[in-house]
Amino acid sequence: MILGIMGAMPDEVDQLCAKLENVTVEPYGGVEYHKGTLAGKQVVVCCAGMGKANAAATTQVLITKFGAEKIIFSGIAGNMTSKIGIGDVVIGKTVLYHDAQLDMICQNPPFLKEYSGDPELIAAAEAAC
């Protein structure tokens, strides 16, 4: 299994890239994809750039070009609350649109208001915390 790990800014992925073994860098679409092993697992690490359009495009490249079966987004996640501090971990069990009318979104494929996270990754993240 290949794991895709992405962040929005270089500071969010640079330390991961530095820990990769047997690393190769493959530029594609303006993004550098760092392929290698981390803790014995095959991973592809990249900096997607900020915003959901960049995240969506980079996620699709990780899946279709690099064969990533699971994706982890690592970073500051645009924290807008004082309840979450530096070093805290947020595990997203579901994600949804915040800037579109959900009734309109659900009229078109894939007809979903929200997307569930991968149960295996959620369990692993919870166990690590």
Indicate where each model-derived feature is located:
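N-terminal short beta-loop-beta anion/metal-coordinating cradle
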Residues: 1-66
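Short active-site-adjacent helix-start/loop capping segments
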Residues: 13-14, 52-55, 79-83, 99-100
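A generic local secondary-structure boundary/capping motif
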Residues: 60-61, 78-80
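Proline-aspartate-enriched helix->loop->beta-strand connector
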Residues: 68-72
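Mid-sequence, gly/pro-rich, charge-dense loop/helix-turn segments that line enzyme active sites
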Residues: 80-129
